[in-house]
């Protein structure tokens, strides 16, 4: 699992993902570290919700941020999460965290040959722009 460096602290994205996955409305999630001028990297959560969730996205995000703060600690600096329709994966089911990180950091990336559905990357990019994470 990935290790990100947040203000000199090494954090496991997997540990944050475990906490997010405990939320009753989250079907699956991914955490990536994106570049930050002040802290080096900051964690961003991508949340795919369970079908039929009635709770507002803002409430789910707020609860997820509080859960990470409580269980991982304030050192995680986890303050940003977005709700996405689905996560980009390989045909074998592995989440393409590296590709998503490159998109979020506005770096060039290659379309992975093993991607399950290439259209997902455009969806993720649109979500990142809409949530002001990716600034073009």
Task: Locate predicted features.
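A cross-kingdom feature marking charged/low-complexity
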Residues: 123-136
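General small-molecule cofactor/ligand-binding pocket signal
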Residues: 81-84
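AMP-binding/adenylate-forming catalytic core of the ANL superfamily
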Residues: 1-76, 86, 91-95, 99-102, ...
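Short arginine-rich
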Residues: 102-108
């Amino acid at each position: 699992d990935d290790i990100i460096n947040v203000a000199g602290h090494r954090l496991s994205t997997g540990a944050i993902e475990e906490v997010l996955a405990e939320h009753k409305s989250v079907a699956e999630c991914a955490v990536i570290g994106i570049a930050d001028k002040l802290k080096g990297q900051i964690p961003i959560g991508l949340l795919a919700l369970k079908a039929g969730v009635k709770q507002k996205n803002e409430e789910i995000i707020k609860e997820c941020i509080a859960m990470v703060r409580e269980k991982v600690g304030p050192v995680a600096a986890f303050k940003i999460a977005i709700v996405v329709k689905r996560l980009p994966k390989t045909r074998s089911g592995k989440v393409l965290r590296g590709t998503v990180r490159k998109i979020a950091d506005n770096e060039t990336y290659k379309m992975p040959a093993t991607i399950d559905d290439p259209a997902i990357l455009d969806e993720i990019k649109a979500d990142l722009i809409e949530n002001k994470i990716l600034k073009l």
